[in-house]
Amino acid sequence: MNPFRFGAVVCLSLVAVVFACAAEPPAGAAAISGRVQNAATGQYLNNARVVVKGTDVVAFTDATGSYRLTNVPTGSVVLEVFYTGMAPQQITVNVTGAATIERDISLAGGARYRNDTEVVKLESLVVSSSREMDGAAIAINEQRFAPNVVNVVSADEFGVVPDGNIGEFLKMLPGITMDYRGGDPREISMNGVPSGYVPVTIGGFNLASSEVSGTGRNVELNAVSINNLSRIEAVYSPTPESPGSALAGSVNLVPRSAFERARPVFNGSVYLAARDSSIEWGRTQGPAKEPTFKIRPGFEFSWVVPVNKRFGFTVSGGASTQYVEGPLLLNTWRGAGAATNGTTLPDTTPDRPYLSDFRVRIESKIADRSSFATTADYKLGPASRLSFSFQYGTFHTDFNQRSLTFIVNRVLPGNFSTRFTRGFAGAGEVNLSNSGNHRYSRTFMPTLTFRHDGPVWKGEAGLGTSHAQNRFRNLDKGRFASTLARRTGVTVSFDEIFYLRPNVITVTDGVTGAPVDPYDINSYALSTAGGSPQKSRNTQNTAFANVRRDFDVGFPLTLKAGVDVRQSRSDNRTANTSVNFLGADGRASTTPVGASDDGAGQVYDQDYYQRAGLYGIPRVQWVSNEDVLDLYRSRPSYFTLDENTLYRSQINNSKISRETISSVFLRGDAQFFNRRLKLVGGVRAEQTNIDARGPLNDPTKNFQRNAAGQVVLGANGRPIAIASDPLGIARLTLIDRGAKAEKEYLRLFPSINASYNVRDNLIARAAWYTSVGRPNFNQYSGGV
């Protein structure tokens, strides 16, 4: 959908909602409206139930604590107010004529009211846990009155979350598993469904995410802070409003609102963060070449300001830095988890595996997070509200991964057991591999929402955009992304193997039998190095509008209809640079002995300090990726660069995709048996349009042609080539984003949710729905 059509749909939808809401007929009976709040905290309560006793007139408060009861009989009526965790309250109201009566209500947990003006008496409690207790009450109350299977939790429910990482919060919710990257929970899986099929929104608007591959649908939460949110909604059974791509559910993150509080509230904290393995004052080595601080400060704050009854705003933010160091041992067991080949790696039974590879790896990184958010709410009238929200977040890591690997490669039958492995003479290898990157992610998201909650018509319309950018930088930051130093032609043996690692590792020269020190960098030859800068962008545009109205057809019935347009644009570029080290003599080697000048000692990382005694492994002398790049820049003749491979990498990893999903839905809510049985059902229709570009490999572009455009043939009857060298051929035949893919399809998604109140504290639920798992964008932009 082009921008004009997109804007037209948004404007027409917004106008339709405004006119529908403005066309309400005057109420013919009395009404009672007001707000319900927690007397202790001043927080307005969402989904508090307000009932006119003895009638079927009932209303639930919205996110601002507001309620409105219509068609209230005249005379003296009693309002019954209920909210989980609070003392139920009954309030008498005298209703006269067809006027609207304002009545605000305050509830308190365990408190007793004698009259409306009496001071609230609070029970004894631990002050530090009050926010968590309020959060638990919110979660239970939301689930109690939800029409579908949903888990709504307050951002305060689990207390302080380290560095504001929302993944640390979400992993505690039932049915949700966080996918970890680099030791951080970053992506959401629900009920076993991969993260690429779990829609994530903020306030109902799609959240942009430039995930690592650049072509996936999974949403990374790096730049989202729990400190900027009011609550989290995990939906396990979709309704017609839910996107059709919710295979097992979706997650909506709700920003703070000024109208959630009756009075201004400021919360803030300042702290120092450190890992127990890295409590060191002053600068010490790691993760890169320059020493860094391992104990870092952080802060976070939130300020909610309801200025008056019509306007309010919120401001929140935070920043944190953590140093993380993680050692890891990796064992490769042949016959149990790794395959044998019957020759160099003899076959064995699962009860008698043998160790063929052992790796010592240490990861270290510095992770910086920062976030800022603000919202502004303005009431256009008694029933209409305009809300603006802006979210901004950054995530920056400087990480390194260093590995020492022992490889047997060949073993004879009878020379292994679960306790030892005797490697074949000269067949083994040890190597040092380093990888590191400088990653910077940024996300910003402005949104605007109009809400109307009138006595007859209720409507909502929204417009928002979310932008995310992710960059991996290495060469321009003064380092190679990867290096490899090798020592081949050695004999590797393992002895005294236990569950963690081999207690004794022996490495000897395959020819002389002399011991080789695998922890000394001078035992290795520098082999290869590479750089992989990557830049990916993702934009998500969202526009929606819906209206609903209540009917009484012998039973309570609500109909809701809406439109929804969501656009996604993903743009990814990557270039993989790979060089081979030859040295001054122009000859590559993997053994730094004799006449070889390829010794890795010339790029020894003297500044990096690995803690001694890491699982009993001696201190290792590592390669410096920074020094290797310095050597490459000062002595380029020592290296070879494959220009053809570099060019092909640039083109093959240049991809862009655009997707527009246009939706309409119709939802009906019906209640029976004195509102004990609730049915929610309907259908959603989604039209998907995709336009993608990727690499095009066209061999005919290298054919000579005559003036008429015909291919020129040689004496052998075959086309005559324009270029014969690999790079020349690649530049002619491999075209940047030359492949074009377009796809469109329409899908219907019916659904129904049923709930039955067996008892006041027991609800039975069932749901049936359909959904679709859209493929990775590489399916369209992968090229041909």
Annotate each PLM feature:
Residues 18-124:
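Periplasm-facing N-terminal accessory domains of Gram-negative outer-membrane beta-barrel systems
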Residues 206, 569-571, 651-655, 720, ...:
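Surface-exposed extracellular loop regions of Gram-negative outer-membrane beta-barrel proteins
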Residues 290-410, 431, 438-455, 750-753:
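Transmembrane beta-barrel wall of Gram-negative outer-membrane proteins
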Residues 213-218, 227-234, 241-253, 258-342, ...:
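Outer-membrane beta-barrel translocator/receptor signature
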Residues 159, 222, 238-241, 275-298, ...:
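Outer-membrane beta-barrel proteins
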Residues 255, 272-276, 319-323, 392-396, ...:
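Transmembrane beta-strands of outer-membrane beta-barrel pores
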Residues 87, 97, 102-110, 114-198, ...:
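Periplasmic N-terminal accessory/gating domains of Gram-negative outer-membrane beta-barrel systems
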Residues 344-354, 417-428, 488-528, 584-652, ...:
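Flexible glycine-rich, low-complexity coil/linker segments exposed to the extracellular/periplasmic environment
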